[in-house]
């Protein structure tokens, strides 16, 4: 007979790779001004979180002008509300904070789930089936980058 040893199982926790590594490749972190940022959020957009997420993954850690160009050329329906949101955030940055649009950089672009609107569709024999309309919240953070000397 073989004997078994009882060992307490401890799961391995994978460390999340921070987004600053990506950022360091494009913009050195010492050039990124920490507290010079503009937040803009849009709530209750009638779109799935997953559809918005694939567009936000493309524009995260990019400059403003490059982001606008990418969003104009994307074939997805989610790119239009995100484009409006980025335009609005950049307009707020130039109007209220006197930032230059050429130095704006998207440091955070995230989407979160909102409420689900339930409707009912009439079906055969007096039955009904639910229609679930999902909504989401989008948050964009624009940061200013110092000019390199």
From Swiss-Prot:
Subunit structure comment from the entry: Part of the 50S ribosomal subunit.
Disulfide-bonded cysteines: none
Subcellular location: Plastid, Chloroplast
Matches recorded under Pfam families: Ribosomal_L22
UniProt record, GO biological process: translation
Family: Belongs to the universal ribosomal protein uL22 family.
Cross-referenced CDD domains: Ribosomal_L22
Protein name, as recorded: Large ribosomal subunit protein uL22c
Gene Ontology CC terms, in alphabetical order: chloroplast; large ribosomal subunit; plastid
Taxonomic path: Eukaryota, Viridiplantae, Streptophyta, Embryophyta, Tracheophyta
Listed transmembrane segments: none
Keywords: Chloroplast, Plastid, Ribonucleoprotein, Ribosomal protein, RNA-binding, rRNA-binding
GO molecular function (one): rRNA binding
Its biological purpose: This protein binds specifically to 23S rRNA.
Gene: rpl22
């Amino acid at each position: 007979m073989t004997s078994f040893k009882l060992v307490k199982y401890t799961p391995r926790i994978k460390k999340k790779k921070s987004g600053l590594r990506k950022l360091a490749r494009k913009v050195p972190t010492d050039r990124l001004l920490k507290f010079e940022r503009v937040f803009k959020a849009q709530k209750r957009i009638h779109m799935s979180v997953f559809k918005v997420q694939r567009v936000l993954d493309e524009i995260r850690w990019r400059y403003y002008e490059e982001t606008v160009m990418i969003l104009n050329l994307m074939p997805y329906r989610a790119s239009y509300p995100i484009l409006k949101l980025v335009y609005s955030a950049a307009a707020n940055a130039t109007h209220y904070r006197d930032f230059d649009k050429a130095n704006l950089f998207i440091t955070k672009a995230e989407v979160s789930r909102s409420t689900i609107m339930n409707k009912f569709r009439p079906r055969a024999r007096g039955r009904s089936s639910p229609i679930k309309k999902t909504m989401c919240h989008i948050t964009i953070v624009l940061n200013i980058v110092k000019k390199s000397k």
